[in-house]
């Protein structure tokens, strides 16, 4: 089974989900990202995927403090994406406790920057996100097209030393309509060294089984957001939303750590 990575997207300090990347189609699921992160941890999360939606659109880094508190509160790695576009920002995120940073817009607009970042911080700490709609990479919080083909861009990133790519099919993101298996398979076939984390569309357990068939193509993990918030998996019945305030969020599970 692929590693399931819960997603926490933060906008204006709250946990939200966007439908197909549309900032005007937002659902607020939780007011406190730190408490949300702890809840995923007691559900045995082994790592978290955090996106700063405000920073992704260039609207400031006012969520960074709460992200630092999330890192302080947990004993598992956190990967952070959204608005990281300089070496100083990478260093600041890592110093804040983030385990791994995800480069998106910066990687598209300045591929040499990715190469330098991997060289300085290592491929384990720097990964690249490929956010695509109809095969075209999009940037600036998914609001602008780049004209780049997703597979060609992925191959370029691999040649520059990147060893993990987070591939999001924007048209599936937040829909729970099922992942774009063909897109992940097509991408994986073209890569020689980089692993792929799938993202977008997972809505039920069968979708995870579909992702599992992609392991021969280097797809070894999957980011899940809306489906977890909507309690689409049977094991989540143990932590029903109506009981969340009774859960001891300071007593972590025994999941394997980093």
UniProtKB/Swiss-Prot annotation:
Alphabetical keyword list: Amino-acid biosynthesis, Cytoplasm, Histidine biosynthesis, Isomerase
Pfam families (UniProt xref): His_biosynth
CDD domains with a match to the protein in the record: HisA (cd04732)
Residues the record marks as active site: 9, 131
Catalytic EC class: isomerase
A molecular function (GO) term: 1-(5-phosphoribosyl)-5-[(5-phosphoribosylamino)methylideneamino]imidazole-4-carboxamide isomerase activity
Entry's Gene Ontology cellular component terms: cytoplasm
Compartments, record wording: Cytoplasm
InterPro entries registered for this protein in UniProt: Aldolase_TIM, His_biosynth, HisA_bact_arch, Isoase_HisA-like, Isoase_HisA-like_bact, RibuloseP-bd_barrel
One of the protein's GO biological processes: L-tryptophan biosynthetic process
Protein name as annotated: 1-(5-phosphoribosyl)-5-[(5-phosphoribosylamino)methylideneamino] imidazole-4-carboxamide isomerase
Organism: Salinibacter ruber (strain DSM 13855 / M31)
Gene: hisA
